[in-house]
Curated annotation (Swiss-Prot):
Keywords: Acetylation, Carbohydrate metabolism, Glucose metabolism, Membrane, Methylation, NADP, Oxidoreductase, Phosphoprotein, Xylose metabolism. Changing residue 153 to M: Loss of activity. The modification N-acetylmethionine is found at residue 1. It catalyses: xylitol + NADP(+) = L-xylulose + NADPH + H(+). Gene3D superfamilies: NAD(P)-binding Rossmann-like Domain. One of its GO terms (molecular function) is identical protein binding. Catalyzes the NADPH-dependent reduction of several pentoses, tetroses, trioses, alpha-dicarbonyl compounds and L-xylulose. Participates in the uronate cycle of glucose metabolism. May play a role in the water absorption and cellular osmoregulation in the proximal renal tubules by producing xylitol, an osmolyte, thereby preventing osmolytic stress from occurring in the renal tubules. GO terms for cellular component: brush border; cytoplasmic microtubule; cytosol; membrane; microvillus. This is L-xylulose reductase. Changing residue 136 to A: Loss of activity. It is found in: Membrane. The keyword Acetylation applies. Homotetramer.
Length: 244
């Protein structure tokens, strides 16, 4: 199926690893020009070697001023994937100021800032656009030791709706994708314990975790004109977890 992404310019945050990296590869394979944003230079260097033509931008999105400087002259962007995120797991009674500050700066505030930069450019050019925010099933279900992470993703889901409301008149669609556990290298490592995995898998009707391509396919669909009437949604990629 042709998604009509050829010739469009996309920006992906958290592009060095996992879902972000795979999204960059898929977008370029679909004919898009891609700006890849990561805080880790080594990841960007290896991405450019694997995927020549990608435009790398190395910046820590937790730093507002550095992000403004790095992205203010990034050029026209038609498609945005806000994927960068951090997860600090702590019991509620042990949550620290540092965990709150870092998590909200990256998982929420950076989405606001990057989306503002990109959306202002779209509006100035008078062109339609699409934004996908990578959220989580944790936005809608409480998970032990995930106080801050769940809260940032809940905030991200509501941000998605407000962005859709305010940017819709400018023909800019905004949606979230909400995966379950995803089998990235980090996901495999974190859920390798059979007992821990079984507790979660027992809550998923399809009985399995998501593969990276399940999430990437959904992101590309939401970026494409195939979803031209979809905005303000939070689309689960969770095997039915949120239905239970």
């Amino acid at each position: 199926m042709d998604l009509g992404l050829a010739g469009r310019r996309a920006l992906v945050t958290g592009a060095g690893k996992g879902i972000g990296r795979s999204t960059v590869l898929a977008l370029q394979a679909a004919g898009a020009q891609v700006v890849a944003v990561s805080r880790t230079r080594e990841d960007l260097d290896s991405l450019v070697r694997e995927c020549p033509g990608v435009e790398p931008v190395c910046v820590d999105l937790a730093d507002w001023e550095a992000t403004e400087q790095a992205l203010s002259n990034v050029g026209p962007v038609d498609l945005l994937v806000n994927n960068a995120a951090v997860a600090t797991l702590q019991p509620f009674l042990e949550v620290t100021k540092e965990a709150c500050d870092t998590s909200f700066n990256v998982n929420f505030r950076a989405v606001v800032q990057v989306s503002q930069i990109v959306a202002r450019g779209m509006i100035a050019r008078g062109v339609p656009g699409a934004i996908v925010n990578v959220s989580s099933q944790a936005s809608q279900r409480a998970l032990t030791n995930h106080t801050v992470y769940c809260s940032t993703k809940g905030a991200l889901d509501m941000l998605t709706k407000v962005m859709a409301l305010e940017l819709g008149p400018h023909k800019i669609r905004v949606n979230a994708v909400n995966p379950t556990v995803v089998m990235t290298p980090m996901g495999r490592a974190n859920w390798s314990d059979p007992h821990k995995a079984k507790v979660m898998l027992d809550r998923i009707p399809l009985g399995k975790f998501a593969e990276v391509e399940n999430v990437v396919d959904t992101i590309l669909f939401l970026l494409s004109n195939r979803s031209s009437m979809t905005t303000g949604s939070a689309l689960p990629v969770d095997g039915g977890f949120l239905a239970t």
